[in-house]
Amino acid sequence: MEQILIIIGVSLFGVLGTIHLVYTFSTEKFNPYDASAAEAMKRTSPQLTKETTIWRAWIGFNASHSLGVMLFAAIYIPLAINNFEVIESSLWFSLLPVVVSASYLILAKKYWFKIPFVGFLVSLVCFLFSAWLIHT
């Protein structure tokens, strides 16, 4: 049961990250409704550097966010399937998904919207229950 819960929770991360990456490059779902806002983003740079624009940074942040979530899934799915004893025997590997999903849940609540919030909440519940089963 612990293994299945980890796989379910991490698979949700992979699905959310993949959808996010597809939406970033193949749709306009992350574009602002106000076209003038997008144009302004394309014309101005962040104070950090003139080497990019707010728009290019926005696309890059969305892409790197997606890739990070997908990488988490790409590491933990095979680990849970092929070497679950590593997760079971390590406090670090059994609790890291709890910390990661709780962090994303907080971000989703504060900055994002309902779909990622629900996805990360379900993942967190899976990870918490799995960790509890492993350590009791």
Regions found by a protein language model. Give the residues of each.
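Interfacial loop-to-transmembrane junctions
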Residues: 102-126
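N-terminal signal-anchor transmembrane alpha helix
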Residues: 1-31
